[in-house]
Structure formats: structure tokens, C-alpha cells
Amino acid sequence: MREHAAWQPQAAAWRPGVAVVPGRPAPAVQRLLTERGSLTARLERLGPVRVHVLREAWQRPAPDEGVALELPVGRHAWLREVVLDCEGGPTIYARSIVPDRLLGPLARLPRLGERPLGRLLFSAADVQRGPLAVARLRGREPLVRWLRGHGLPSPAGGWARRSTLSVAGRRLLVTEVFFPEGVEGER
């Protein structure tokens, strides 16, 4: 897996990596935040992973997501929001934004249903992850509002990460929120 540098996180809440974030996470959380490979595969080593789809639709991404993907303002992208429940491990909210036509392995994205996106992405030989950005959630971020809109508990005090990935020449943005009460048990 090679890295690409198409996006460098610039927003105040997102920091480039765990080392520069105030209030270091617990070691178990830090291991998840810095995972460069498939987070799904890591979770599946802990136990079965269940995917609960919250929303899948074409819509305009949030402004900072559009910037991260270098999208023109107002352009639509495929949005997928899910909750990953890992038996014996953490609970994670994941938000994926895929612009453009869905070609190659990403063409199956709208039909994934309750299968993890990570399996699809990391089965591709040419997957590339951009820089990881990390945020400590304080409760005012758009991510927290989205979670509340889905009736999920507030992740305030928890951690989030995001990065761009490139598969078959198509870039997407994946944001993952680690619920505070669900991460401490991760080994």
C-alpha cells in the first residue's frame, strides 16, 4: 500500500497524526487511530463485526469533506454512514464520501449493504491511504451533530480519524469515530 499526498488536513479540529493532538489517547485507542491498514481486518481479529447501515445516498458532502476531496462546491458524492459493532471490541461510526462515477471495485459500493467497506477497499491491490488526521471530539463538531441526528450517543471526549484512500484511481474520504465507552476493551 503506497501513500498519496493529495490532501493535507488543514482544519483546526483535525491534526496530522496522534502525536500533535492535545490529550494523548489511551494506548488501545492510539493503536486504532494509527492503523494504516484495514481497520475492519483489525476489528475482525477481535471478534465478529456487524455493520448497521444508517444512510446511503447521493448528496453534497460537508464543506470540509469537499475540500479534502478537492470537489467543486455543490458537487454531489456517494455518502455511506454506518455503525460497526465489534463483539469484544469497540463501536465505531464510519462516514465514507465517494465522488464521481463509481468505477472498478467501487462500483459495488451502493450494493454493499451490511458488509464492511474495508473488505472491499483493502481487497484491491492498488489501495493507497493518504495522511491520517486525528481529532479529539469536544461535542460541537459537525460529526457530533450527525451522530445525534441518527439517535446515537454523543462521542464527546472520544476520538476520530479520517483519511483519503485511493482505489482504482478513485479517491474517497473515510471518517471514523471511536465511541469512548467502546474502545477501552480493544487489545
From Swiss-Prot:
Copy the pathway line from the protein's UniProt record. Answer: Cofactor biosynthesis; ubiquinone biosynthesis
Gene Ontology CC annotation, any one: cytosol
Coiled-coil spans are: none
Q: What is the main EC category here?
A: lyase
Record GO terms (molecular function):
chorismate lyase activity
Give the domain of life: Bacteria
Residues bound to substrate: 80, 117, 176
Q: Which UniProt keywords apply?
A: Cytoplasm, Lyase, Pyruvate, Ubiquinone biosynthesis
EC?
Answer: 4.1.3.40
Q: Which reaction does it catalyse?
A: chorismate = 4-hydroxybenzoate + pyruvate
Give the Pfam families listed for this entry: Chor_lyase (PF04345)
Gene Ontology biological process: pyruvate biosynthetic process; ubiquinone biosynthetic process
Q: Which InterPro entries match?
A: Chorismate--pyruvate_lyase (IPR007440), Chorismate_lyase_/UTRA_dom_sf (IPR028978)
What does the UniProt entry say about where the protein is found? Cytoplasm
Classify the main location. Answer: cytoplasm
Q: Which HAMAP family does the UniProt record give?
A: UbiC
Outline what the protein does. Answer: Removes the pyruvyl group from chorismate, with concomitant aromatization of the ring, to provide 4-hydroxybenzoate (4HB) for the ubiquinone pathway.
Recorded family membership: Belongs to the UbiC family.
What's the protein name?
A: Probable chorismate pyruvate-lyase
Can you name the source organism? Halorhodospira halophila (strain DSM 244 / SL1)
